[in-house]
């Protein structure tokens, strides 16, 4: 393969090329420069004649920004060349004044029309082509009632409700599958949810038809029918020849014996999961190998071949999924998933030369990025369009087989290699200069990946091509070589080593924690590292809103109902969604009520934000509970709630016009283009935080220091996948690469699960990982080093020892006093000891009484409709063995009065028992800054009633014997004397600050309620400032 230099005058960007771009070789930079050079040299006329296809939506956005930046830089350069003729230009450009002016104008025009450039994912390109050239074939369009996911979900529900699965699964298989998808934990999902999420996937593991399985079963029964009736005792004795398994077979053995005797031709004969697991050949007890041969050996060996796939969860699910897909194709005419859109376009292009000719004419430059992740059908489309001799434009296929780690997304290496060898040798190019890693680290990586020969064993072997380094970083490798192996026997020791080494590198090399990464296989491994780490670490993973649930479609339905409340079809659509989950009967019975609700919400949307309207809707009661509660009780309901919040907030920021919000959201779904703001990411930009991420998520990223914990964890993968993931992990590093290994790990040919490092040792003919490490470090100590002890003890005396672990800490801020009313207000009555009973005061006073009654009121929050007996029982429980024991009856009576008495707030009078329990919050803490001072407060009661918000502060103060002692005038004097008017002002300010996050017009009222003196004459209640 020839080296490709985009700036070389002898290099060409006109023609068809296959470009291999190893990690760190500036692939994206090359793409943007190919676009720029093609524009400058005139091989393309306008930006709309450019087609770039890449892997993800995020990559399309990044590419467009990078190309835009490249064009701006070129525009600045040519502008400078016009005013300063001696300005150096790219070597492939003529420096004549006329030429420079023409190119300046072309770059300026290209920038102005950059939005016309076609940058797609493969699925986006297929949808675009189908819409433009085959308009009669469209994906499902959201109807006036259902969005696409809802339409699909309805058909899946019908499929399951009508038991259509019984043509592909046995009843026991379906029951087994349903059980494993019950939504009892965060790790399990309803079967419908998974079918809805995966209905576009390819069911590669689907089982043979039941008719074929039944034929094989009958042949097996005929072969072994002479063994009937089976002896349970012999079966139990036979089972002792095998090791203990996770699933018990105590109940299965008798059932198996009976099934074989009474109805062996039933498919139930194959469904004994515990026996399938138990009687696997690898589970044989080696101590029992000397036992005499048993006729049950061939009996069960043949049975296992039939029963094993029949009892596996994923093959059963894929079988069901395949049947559901066929059902959807029949009942959802012209419905195309991502994968189906590829297959459809491939089929249409095969028989439509006119469209092929139009596409070839439209696109003069085509760049296919991440080509190693392309599958056979995608290549059929691109080869038909642009690899053909009839295509006169330029084509670049850009990829790296060493980084093909997405086999689960149908990435197909044989297709990559087939495409590569369809190009002549002179058109097979390579980027062979690494701009990421230091020269020393690059030399070590070259050595490491040149040892396996070939690098990947495939039908056409893949070789590793060493790279030159132009990494700009300079580093002194005194303590560690560029690649350092460290020994760890468990995750705790590994984490401690990483923590200490990272701290040392930060101190000795001024490398921030934020420029370091730990690569893991999965989240459980990340969690263990975070748990044991002594320095700050964060797990970084990104999920896009549009990849997870149907929340965007739900929001479209909601916006349509909010904008058009007079349209009953749109109202019915949202009422049937998971937000409401109402049946058609319930909708018909309460349609007028719901219409009224959406007319009210329509006004709310125009006066306030979409987010505030969403929150108001979530708090509305429908039948027996709020809409928010209904949503949160559904599978993934909490995630959908968060996504709807994020979408509402994003649309509020984008435009104030409610109609534009709807159009903007629809446009996002159609084009697939959206801001990164609509991604849920835990990516941390904190320089004091080490990032933990998976190998797959790290692709395309780079860090100064990389700890490859992923290479030391055993996983059941093919040697090829292990090697590719190891390559991706190691090539993320710019300066240092650290690899943990187990000192006791040995090669085992019979072991299915290996770590990537153990696989590498196998491939390179080392008998163990320690042997591999010893070989590398002894043969090339300038490239590889190792530690077999913790860092401190492994250092020689003449070397600087690793510093003692320094724990991270936040900078010290000057201390500030936090004020509270319990600490600043002297209440003489509360400081008194327990008082004797007075004739009219039926229970003691003092601070302890206040605390106990507050606790009792807190326990009753949300239950203000409680009767006297219920309050009395609660009081007996809470006041037992306290100074108030014996006063439960009078205290319960007082509290009952508080709940039932009409409270005369300025906005309207009502009793607490009339407040909806879901609108109540008790003992809410806040921190507020007021005039340079920090105030902490605890709101006794915060609630909403009839769209108004209220605060109540309970008072148990003793002001006198009669309720007249608690008249408004007396309470005003008491409030002023105690400074409680300031408390009222601060509490209301804190509450308004909270509410204004959702609606800046919301107001709060506050009142003090004196438990001892409240009556129906207005005593015991005070609303300051009224």
Swiss-Prot record:
A GO CC term assigned to this protein in UniProt: exodeoxyribonuclease V complex
Positions contributing to ATP binding: 21-28
EC number: 3.1.11.5, 5.6.2.4
UvrD-like helicase ATP-binding domain segment(s): 1-438
Region feature (DNA-binding and helicase activity, interacts with RecC): 1-766
Catalytic site: 953 (for nuclease activity)
Cofactor notes: Binds 1 Mg(2+) ion per subunit.
Domains (record comment): The N-terminal DNA-binding domain is a ssDNA-dependent ATPase and has ATP-dependent 3'-5' helicase function. This domain interacts with RecC.
Note: In the RecBCD complex, RecB has a slow 3'-5' helicase, an exonuclease activity and loads RecA onto ssDNA, RecD has a fast 5'-3' helicase activity, while RecC stimulates the ATPase and processivity of the RecB helicase and contributes to recognition of the Chi site.
Subunit structure: Heterotrimer of RecB, RecC and RecD. All subunits contribute to DNA-binding. Interacts with RecA.
Protein known as: RecBCD enzyme subunit RecB
Naturally occurring in which organism (per UniProt): Chlamydia trachomatis serovar D (strain ATCC VR-885 / DSM 19411 / UW-3/Cx)
Phylogenetic placement of the source organism: Bacteria, Pseudomonadati, Chlamydiota, Chlamydiia, Chlamydiales
